[in-house]
Amino acid sequence: LILLQEGSLTLKYEDKEAIITRSNVFDDAPVGLQFNKQVAVEVIANEDSEYLCFQTENDKTYPTTLFNKDNVVVVDRGAGQWNECATRNVRTMVDYKINPNSNIAFGETVNYPGKWSTFIPHLHDQPELYYYRFNRPEGFGASFYGDNVYQIKDRSYICVTEKLAHPQVTAPGYAMNYFWIIRHFDYNPWTGAENVKEHEWLLDPNCKIWPEK
């Protein structure tokens, strides 16, 4: 998997050539290329650029996919709930439904300033990696991992390797983007998360949030 963060790349693969560009991870949709082990890809930087590259073992094959704004599933989650305290923009590129032969699910989430995400707190069996970007270099937030809390800054990363809740929040004034990637287990793919039971009352559309009575 190649995912462009910013800049311009030329990708050469399977007798094809694609030029992908991205000004930043906040204003532009994700662009990148997912390919299997049988495909060779040449990456040429057309200017100063930054991209992420991920790989994992997989015996299955699937068609090479070039991602852009036309084939990324974008959903605003948390809208209209909890006084908009967990509103975020989720950009799913691949999950088990989209490509069951891929053994990774991945995408991006953009936290609006001062908002929470991965909320209500949830957990899952499969390992997950987060890579964070902020719209300003001094931006910061917090990532919860079970009972531990970690400060996150621009280009921080968190590895979720245990079945623990992992909500996160960004400070007021600072937008936060994080790339997330989940590795399926061979006989237990990630198809969704398990909510932390004690917080499920928040899913009631009629729940009262203080100072409501």
Regions found by a protein language model. Name each.
Residues 21-22, 54, 62-65, 130-131, ...:
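A short, polar/proline- and glycine-enriched secondary-structure boundary/capping micro-motif
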Residues 81-128:
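A short glycine-rich, His/Asp/Glu-containing loop-to-beta-strand
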Residues 42-48, 100, 135-139, 148:
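Secondary-structure boundary elements
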Residues 1-44:
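Extended, compositionally biased flexible segments
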Residues 26-46, 56, 151-173, 179-183:
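Conserved metal-binding segment of the jelly-roll/cupin
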Residues 48-89, 144, 179-213:
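Double-stranded beta-helix
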Residues 37, 45, 53-58, 94-96, ...:
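Short, structured patches in soluble enzyme cores that scaffold and shape functional sites
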Residues 1-17, 113-114, 119, 125-157, ...:
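Glycine- and acidic-residue-biased ligand/ion/polar-headgroup-sensing regions
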